[in-house]
Amino acid sequence: MRALFYKDGKLFTDNNFLNPVSDDNPAYEVLQHVKIPTHLTDVVVYEQTWEEALTRLIFVGSDSKGRRQYFYGKMHVQNRNAKRDRIFVRVYNVMKRINCFINKNIKKSSTDSNYQLAVFMLMETMFFIRFGKMKYLKENETVGLLTLKNKHIEISPDEIVIKFVGKDKVSHEFVVHKSNRLYKPLLKLTDDSSPEEFLFNKLSERKVYECIKQFGIRIKDLRTYGVNYTFLYNFWTNVKSISPLPSPKKLIALTIKQTAEVVGHTPSISKRAYMATTILEMVKDKNFLDVVSKTTFDEFLSIVVDHVKSSTDG
């Protein structure tokens, strides 16, 4: 698709706005159906018919902080939302197998690659940290789970603190208490004498991909699942602990904010890029709050999974 440059309702083929696009260009039909937010700058509209735009990227613009914002057609968004629902159910269905893998290999006396994979998977399923590709570390010093170094691990008698700067220069901090099952394996893996050495020094991107492949999911699926899982846990906790309860709308907004703080991005990104919309629609129901208040978290999670599964099957 050709990128066209937008200014004051007009389209141009150049970013100096010297060469206007003809009035019969199909992109003008697209503009009749969408509203480009006035606060966006450097807007690019993609040349396509309205029918094509329904399933594609329509336009991109920069917000006040210089971040590029992407706007897609309705059917693209619907397909993306349905995909998130399927990912949530798929990961939930393999979590027992993942935990079995962790339990089997984390008991090893050596710190071989399988042991490191077990610790890696345990950390990922606890904190849902971004993967951390080596190229991002080299390009902009962005750290993820795979690129954690010993210097990012602070050990004390009662807890271990994991501190690093991730994507978009967001600072992350995770606390592992001595009572947590991750404490001893992480302590065993950390080498204070080599601060610049990678924590997972026997792993590579390929080894992690091969490991996760056996479960029929992708590593990024764990983060999508994790955001929704964290949202559900926070939502369940809020229903149990807040009195009087705010409206469902305010309760959802509060829970999304809490979830975003845990996983390290803004509430809007949490909702737009990770949340399964079927889950959001489900928890909007006032009557559903009564169900939540009478269940354990595992029961609540099972109810949600069954509902999402029935929606995807339908």
From Swiss-Prot:
Reactions listed under catalytic activity: ATP-independent breakage of single-stranded DNA, followed by passage and rejoining
Active site positions, chain numbering: 274
Residues at the site labelled Involved in religation: 168
Gene3D superfamilies, A to Z: DNA topoisomerase I domain (3.30.66.10), Topoisomerase I, Chain A, domain 3 (3.90.15.10)
Location of the protein in the cell: Virion
MF (Gene Ontology): DNA binding; DNA topoisomerase type I (single strand cut, ATP-independent) activity
Protein task: Releases the supercoiling and torsional tension of DNA introduced during the DNA replication and transcription by transiently cleaving and rejoining one strand of the DNA duplex. Introduces a single-strand break via transesterification at the specific target site 5'-[CT]CCTTp site in duplex DNA. The scissile phosphodiester is attacked by the catalytic tyrosine of the enzyme, resulting in the formation of a DNA-(3'-phosphotyrosyl)-enzyme intermediate and the expulsion of a 5'-OH DNA strand. The free DNA strand then undergoes passage around the unbroken strand thus removing DNA supercoils.
Protein name listed in UniProt: DNA topoisomerase 1B
UniProt source species: Vaccinia virus (strain Western Reserve) (VACV)
Gene label: OPG111
